[in-house]
Amino acid sequence: MADMASSIQAAAATQPDGMVISLPDPDALGAAIKAAVAAGVPVITMNSGLESSASLGALMHVGQPEYLAGQSAGARAASEGATKALCMIQEAYNTALVDRCEGYGESVPMEFTDTTSDPATIQTRATAALQASSGVDAVLSVGPHVCEAVAKAIDDLGMTVHHSCFDLSPGVMDLIGAGKVSFTIDQQQRLQGYMPIIVLHLYNNGAGLLPGANIPSGPGFVDKSNASSVAALAGIDR
């Protein structure tokens, strides 16, 4: 995060027409973003950081309301039989990922498992957590690489659990097709990169006009019913 804060400071010093910044850790990045705004640089946050965006002076946020997405995932998992879950989280400091877990937990009681982002470590920690947790019948993996590694752990243990995930990858799509993942939540990252640039263009060329609210890019469910259609858009609209 320190390197990212330094990059924000360096970019702001060039006085760009605008900056689009992901905000995974408001405490670590907030001062750099406030300084950019104070220097007259229009800032739009994207992906992570919805709750802190306005307080740091950003014009708006483009991204998925992560708590809502977690709530949606949890409600669906509960309707599909989940009663007790582990939430596999690769960045315990990332407020967006925490929100996914906590939103899910409104419908399905859950405990956090800090997996780190290393695939081998994810599988090892997931295996240990699944073995140690009595009564767990569901898992939420809040990133695609986490989803793939956790699926391997579940397979190796010979367990049958409800597994749902966040975000897309070829591996996640294969797991959905094989019936090993019930669904994944698509936050449409392409829109998170595209829409802020459109908004900044309008802001800089349209007398400072902005949309009337933040732009939500998700959540959307991808499951067996639509996975092939979504996969066909890879590299085109995703």
Report residues per predicted region.
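Hydrophobic alpha-helical
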Residues: Q9-A38, Y104, T115-L175
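Conserved acidic residues
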Residues: D17, L59, T83, D137, ...
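Short beta-strand segments enriched in small/hydrophobic residues
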Residues: L23, L59-M60, K84-A92
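Flexible loop/hinge segments that line or gate small-molecule binding clefts
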Residues: A31-L68, S169-G177, V181-S182, A232
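Structural detector of well-ordered beta-strand residues that form the stable sheet scaffold
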Residues: I44, H162-S164, S182, V222
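Hydrophobic alpha-helical segments within soluble ligand-binding/sensing domains
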Residues: M60-A85, A120-Q123, L168-V172, Q187-A207
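Short, solvent-exposed amphipathic alpha-helices that sit
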Residues: A69-A73, A92-M110, R125, A149, ...
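Hinge/cleft segment of the Venus flytrap/periplasmic-binding protein
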Residues: S107-V108, L191-R238
